[in-house]
Amino acid sequence: MKQGDRIPGLVGWEHHGAPAKIPGLEVVAEGLVWSGGVTSSRYTATIVPGPKNNFVFNAATIFWAQGLASPPGHMPPWSHWARPAGPDPRVQRITENLLRRALGG
């Protein structure tokens, strides 16, 4: 993906705003969402380096798992003008890349 690309329905009603000032923190996605359908709010997804050549990925959204899979019987959540769009190959690929990075590959 490149700057400006969007994944509709990925940022849910719970999301993280401006990141903390942490050395080495990398912003990997950011943008505006509409809180309550009327008020704009910022979300920021980040990767934070750890002390042992590890990292923490903060997707900044409660809906990240919705972009990975939709098993039989799964009922997608929706509320507050937010509804996930379901599995998305880009979310799956981003997650795969993060797991490969975590495993050192």
Model segments located where?
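Extracellular ligand-binding/catalytic regions of CAZymes and related secreted enzymes
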Residues: 1-105
